[in-house]
């Protein structure tokens, strides 16, 4: 909290805990390279914002109110998210969103497995960068 340096405000768009570090670094105006999968919630266009979820054996990606849910044995489901009720309902599957979800989770897995999900420096893979 530093109102002399950063004006207080409210962001109504999609953001989760993985977006905190990139957003704070963006507010501070610091150039950065990081392996974060989160995004600067104040400088990422709404149509590019995503949220990651996991529950039991499923993982999911939310974008534009649509959820791609990846389960065991390559199962895929779709859902629609209503931000007013914070509820979910049935939705048609969206191959592009499913591919994006697979890409995010597969990239994270491959980086971690190969020991390349590390802070910037020798051998690091940059996932996100400053604007």
Task: Give the location of each predicted region.
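Membrane-interface soluble catalytic domains
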Residues: 4-131
């Amino acid at each position: 909290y530093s109102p002399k340096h950063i004006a207080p405000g409210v962001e109504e768009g999609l953001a989760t805990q993985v977006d905190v570090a990139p957003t704070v670094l963006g507010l501070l105006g610091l150039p950065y390279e990081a392996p974060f999968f989160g995004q600067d919630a104040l400088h990422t266009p709404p149509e590019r914002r995503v949220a990651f979820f996991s529950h039991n054996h499923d993982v999911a990606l939310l974008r534009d109110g649509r959820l791609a849910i990846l389960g065991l044995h390559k199962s895929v489901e779709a859902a629609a998210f209503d931000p007013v009720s914070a509820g979910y309902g049935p939705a048609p599957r969206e191959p592009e969103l499913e591919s994006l979800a697979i890409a995010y989770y597969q990239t994270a897995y491959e980086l971690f497995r190969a020991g390349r999900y590390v802070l910037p420096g020798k051998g690091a893979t940059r996932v996100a960068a400053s604007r």
